């Protein structure tokens, strides 16, 4: 067989795409396609080929279009039909709907598939549909492995830079403040630390309760250090008694001296290292009244210190949870607020979901109409999406950030102001700013410059750094968080990490990107609507200020 050309035309005879495999001019191809239109209008729709004096047209109609192979009259018609079937499969894999614009948009991929199926001499390659897809994807296993290796190297290098920065900051603190053992008060307390005489203990507590704040902090650290040294050889009862006595002494000392408003006490290095960051609480399982739809989105973003957006990425998932078998034969209709044909989104349906129905009618339904969704009250992800915005594009930014840093006049450190602005229609909860430093002095939250009155230090340790929490940021609210923190140099304050979350339970709620549910209907009767609930949520994953 020899294929002269492969073309796509409308039923009215308008040529859309054509690929010539022999030396045919454009005018000659247009003339042949015009002749085909005249021939096909004179025969019934049951035929699959027509001929004139010079060539044979093997064709297949689909919607308002024709796929046409122009061959010589001596070509094997059986092989021509097999080739036409392969062309049809390949074209269908690229088109979500049969429209002129969709065909033009995927013209490069369609023509490339033509070249894979038929060589330039007009002879069909011995390929299957799967092989054509593999060749067109142009994936390389070795290239993927190399990309993974390079990505892992970048991650390791980033972690190593952070670790070295923390180590430099720690050494700088030690160099500035010296070791605690050089402090005279520490040595004096250490001589009597092993004494069990209650008179000696009371005398030491009484002395340090009226001492300076620096001396009090030194004494507390020495107490923790002594307890840590004795702990391995002490009995459990004795350990608990010493812990209780130490806590009592700490309360007495803490009552003798005041702190500035908003200042948070600094826990000792030993207590912080042993306790670590408390594990996050387990999420409550929301109540399900029959059909519960969860729309979850996670945002990653990176800002410069002046607020410029370097990158942003959003990932989302739509989960379906059913606990009633009578409601399992259902379909989900998406609202008009989301455009499933938006090329800036990457949508991916579950393998059991009818993708054609999703793209054409925004309907989430099973491919096998005889089956139903599981009614085991377990969440099932049926749709995922991803969107990446270019630099300086704020379309995926729910919370903008700008930082201002200046040397502090009151102590060795920096005055930091973090300006923020929320663009959400709902409030953000549990907004936590984490600075990767572990200061020796307490963090002072400036209540005069801060617009958030509930800001507080919630964690300080050598591994995570210092975390300051704002319980909530109102919808479309802008404000500032101001504080003074000790750091060896300005770059040690970065990268700052911000975490937040937002959740709404409302049937009419829509996600940050506009994903929402219009209705839930029976699979066999779209006029019968079913009751359902919707929960939308937005969380940050890696939200950084570099």
Curated annotation (Swiss-Prot):
Organism placement in taxonomy: Eukaryota, Fungi, Dikarya, Ascomycota, Saccharomycotina
CDD domains to which the protein is assigned, alphabetical: AP_delta-COPI_MHD, Delta_COP_N
Database matches in InterPro entries: AP2_Mu_C_sf, AP_mu_sigma_su, Coatomer_dsu, Longin-like_dom_sf, MHD
GO terms, biological process: endoplasmic reticulum to Golgi vesicle-mediated transport; Golgi distribution to daughter cells; Golgi inheritance; Golgi localization; protein transport; retrograde vesicle-mediated transport, Golgi to endoplasmic reticulum
Subunit structure, as described in the record: Oligomeric complex that consists of at least the alpha, beta, beta', gamma, delta, epsilon and zeta subunits. Interacts with DSL1.
Gene3D superfamilies for the chain: 3.30.450.60, Mu homology domain, subdomain B
Keyword terms: Cytoplasm, Cytoplasmic vesicle, ER-Golgi transport, Golgi apparatus, Membrane, Phosphoprotein, Protein transport, Transport
UniProt biased composition (Low complexity): 260-276
Function: The coatomer is a cytosolic protein complex that binds to dilysine motifs and reversibly associates with Golgi non-clathrin-coated vesicles, which further mediate biosynthetic protein transport from the ER, via the Golgi up to the trans Golgi network. Coatomer complex is required for budding from Golgi membranes, and is essential for the retrograde Golgi-to-ER transport of dilysine-tagged proteins.
Name this protein carries in UniProt: Coatomer subunit delta
PANTHER family: COATOMER SUBUNIT DELTA
Region spans: Disordered: 236-287
Membrane disposition: Peripheral membrane protein
Species of provenance: Saccharomyces cerevisiae (strain ATCC 204508 / S288c)
Residue ranges, annotated region (Interaction with DSL1): 190-440
Pfam (any one): Adap_comp_sub
